[in-house]
């Protein structure tokens, strides 16, 4: 059996602002949008789900079944994989958008991780190959 990641979820107050933030930063396309969520294509390998905080606590009937309730509070951490050659470009992009890189880590096994916060305070990491055994 094989398993891989498909979706990453963040819970936000400002759906429109968060959608614009991630589109501007990563150039991702919005796949689905409604009053409670946005689904965005991240690198053709993952879907970033932006849920309106509190908007999914009742679950939802959809064609083909029922999506159970879910929600989260506080700051969440997520990591996106980037190529080593793109680190400086992402540093420039973040700087141009006045997004502070709050930490840069060089793990002992190699690679680089850039950490910053999104509009809602979530901790976002951009990591190059070598940061861990599987990447």
Feature map (PLM): residue ranges:
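Short metal-binding segments enriched for Cys and/or His
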Residues: 127
């Amino acid at each position: 059996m094989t398993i891989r990641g498909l979706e990453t979820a963040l819970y936000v107050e400002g759906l429109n602002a968060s959608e614009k933030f991630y589109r501007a930063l990563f150039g991702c396309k919005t796949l689905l949008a409604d009053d409670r969520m946005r689904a965005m294509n991240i690198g053709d390998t993952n879907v970033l789900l932006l849920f309106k905080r509190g908007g999914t606590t009742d679950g939802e009937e959809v064609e083909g079944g029922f999506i159970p309730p879910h929600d989260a509070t506080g700051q969440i951490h997520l990591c996106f994989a980037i190529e080593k050659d793109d680190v400086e470009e992402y540093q420039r992009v973040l700087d141009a958008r006045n997004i502070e890189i709050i930490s840069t880590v060089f793990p002992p096994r190699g690679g680089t991780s850039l950490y910053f916060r999104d509009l809602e305070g979530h901790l976002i990491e951009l990591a190059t190959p070598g940061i861990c055994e599987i990447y």
